[in-house]
Curated annotation (Swiss-Prot):
GO biological process, one term: rRNA base methylation
Pfam families in UniProt: Methyltransf_5
Record's protein name: Ribosomal RNA small subunit methyltransferase H
Organism of provenance: Geobacillus kaustophilus (strain HTA426)
Predominant localisation class: cytoplasm
Length: 310
């Protein structure tokens, strides 16, 4: 069931400088916490478009947000299709866009989704259960070199080669079908001293697989660039990230859009192409308060960055 504590709720939504009659997008509807608070700040003339690729999330949010009626429109699609979907709905610009890139707790807590190393379940990890690629296919079919690449790039796992080698060894004799079986393989591959420090030994590998299954980083990069393009002047984008890979993409995208490229000498007038597109509002990311961390330990790695369209 969708019971989920929303992270950095007021900071992320208030950071959008809500206009009561504005048009807003929640790219990561999830359990609907950010959307609900955002809708409460809108007048009857305001509008929210809420994206999620998880059908269960949309079904839950329809009930939770039913009182807002036609003020909220749900879009069951990955946020990388942000511009395409809004264009089809006749929306050319928006006043604010919100991203919360954490996997929602219900997805983590439903064993059958296969996201968690805490429960034994089929190796799945699909946000959109209609897509074909699963974690089981990656683990059992992808070559050693590809496994090393995703474990190192997406999980920043220093024992990527050892884990990939152990997976290759085990799958020669039998397929690795469940999260529990994969955890055992990971534990067997990682040296004992490393297993005893730095959190659960499977954490980084599971993160890497989840990102690879859902193509999360590329989808986010594409969606963030589209969001910036869609913003009206004065519109804002709020991004909550939970690990360094996402945060790096956000930070670099904001930085690039807030700087002028090097100018050719002798230009009498600054062309529009050379003007910065964004103003960064958060020089340093906003992090959860001690009080929020006490209420919700899953918020501990959250970072919020906000930028405004010029």
């Amino acid at each position: 069931m969708f019971q989920h504590t929303t992270v950095l709720l007021k900071e992320a939504v208030d950071g959008l400088n809500i206009r009561p009659d504005g048009i807003y997008v929640d790219c990561t509807l999830g359990s609907g916490g950010h959307s609900e608070y955002l809708l409460s700040r809108l007048s009857e003339h305001g509008k929210l478009f809420a994206f999620d690729q998880d059908e269960a999330a949309i079904m839950h949010a329809r009930e939770r947000l039913a009182r807002y009626g036609r003020q909220v429109q749900f879009v069951h699609r990955n946020f990388r299709f942000l511009q395409e979907e809004l264009s089809a709905l006749g929306v050319k610009s928006v006043d604010g866009v919100l991203f919360d890139l954490g996997v929602s707790s219900p997805q983590l807590d439903e064993p059958e989704r296969g996201f968690s190393y805490q429960h034994d379940a089929p190796l799945d990890m699909r946000m959109n259960r209609k897509q074909r690629l699963t974690a089981a296919e990656i683990v059992n079919c992808w070559p050693y070199e590809e496994l090393v690449r995703i474990f190192f790039r997406y999980g920043e796992e220093r024992f990527s080669k050892q884990v990939a080698r152990k997976i290759e060894e085990v799958r020669r004799t039998r397929p690795i079908k469940t999260t529990g079986e994969l955890v055992d393989v990971i534990k067997a591959a990682i040296p004992a001293p490393a297993r005893r420090s730095g959190g659960h030994p499977a954490k980084r590998i599971f993160q890497a697989l989840r990102i690879a299954v859902n193509d999360e980083l590329e989808a986010f990069r594409e969606a963030l660039e589209q969001a910036i393009e869609l913003l009206a002047p004065g519109g804002r984008v709020s991004v909550i990230t939970f690990h360094s890979l996402e945060d790096r993409i956000c930070k670099e995208t904001f930085k690039k859009a807030s700087e002028s490229p090097p100018l050719p000498p002798g230009l009498p007038v600054l062309p529009d192409d050379y003007r910065p597109v964004l103003k960064i509002i958060t020089k340093k990311p906003i992090v959860p308060s001690e009080e929020e961390l006490e209420r919700n330990h899953r918020a501990r790695s959250a970072k919020l960055r906000i930028a405004e369209k010029l």
